[in-house]
Amino acid sequence: MAKKKAFIPFLYFTSIVFFPWWISLCCNKSLKTWITNWWNTRQRETFLNEIQEKSLLEKFIQLEELFQLDEMIKEYPETDLQKFRLGIHKETIQFIKIHNEYRIHTIFNFSTNLISFVILSSYSFWGKEKLFILNSWVQEFLYNLSDTIKAFLILLLTDLCIGFHSPHGWELMIGYIYKDFGFAHYEQLLSGLVSTFPVILDTIFKYWIFRYLNRVSPSLVVIYHAIND
């Protein structure tokens, strides 16, 4: 009976880990079709951010240059000009299709993440007791570790998150999240987040060491600073 009670929180934690994948799989089969039909049949307004407007403008400038080139080579045979105009027409249609698919992908990703957040929040709320049990297990495990191991783990975690090489990792992680939500790549915003987020984490961590660890385990703080130096 005790083993069964201990197994239930572990099963609950496993379900939380795999829940987002399951939700994404279900939404991919049902929600994507509905969003595609809604976008193609009912949506009439075009909403673009600054980056997408710039991309569209660049594409149409390229097409305009092609049309100007078309005017400059009118001395060529009519059959060649028709083929040239047909090629431009096909490129325009292809560009519109790509843009349409991108908008559908953006709406789908954002909707899927929002649904996943709502479901996981509700699931976590109704399973608070199991989360409390898991939290007690983690605290007991950490409490049984020696101060040297604790200091080593803290140092390893901080070096991974806010160390010298961490900006590249944050760039990959934030870029993946940004892309997963379907947003366009914005280099300036990405650089700003990468340069400020680790600094904020570093400040919070140092405050945590100062307020919490100094009170709970002063020896751990001494070992941590000794290893860090």
Swiss-Prot record:
Protein's UniProt keywords contain Metal-binding: no
A GO MF label: antiporter activity
GO cellular component annotations of the record: chloroplast inner membrane
Entries under Pfam families matching the protein: CemA
Signal sequence region: none
Catalytic reactions on record: K(+)(in) + H(+)(out) = K(+)(out) + H(+)(in)
Domain of life: Eukaryota
Cited InterPro entries: CemA
Predominant subcellular localization, coarse grouping: plastid
Transmembrane domains' residue ranges: 6-26, 107-127, 152-172, 190-210
Keywords, sorted A to Z: Antiport, Chloroplast, Hydrogen ion transport, Ion transport, Membrane, Plastid, Plastid inner membrane, Potassium, Potassium transport, Transmembrane, Transmembrane helix, Transport
Bilayer topology annotation: Multi-pass membrane protein
Annotated family: Belongs to the CemA family.
PANTHER family in the record: CHLOROPLAST ENVELOPE MEMBRANE PROTEIN, CHLOROPLAST ENVELOPE MEMBRANE PROTEIN-RELATED
Function: Contributes to K(+)/H(+) antiport activity by supporting proton efflux to control proton extrusion and homeostasis in chloroplasts in a light-dependent manner to modulate photosynthesis. Prevents excessive induction of non-photochemical quenching (NPQ) under continuous-light conditions. Indirectly promotes efficient inorganic carbon uptake into chloroplasts.
Official protein name in the record: Potassium/proton antiporter CemA
Lineage summary: Eukaryota, Viridiplantae, Streptophyta, Embryophyta, Tracheophyta
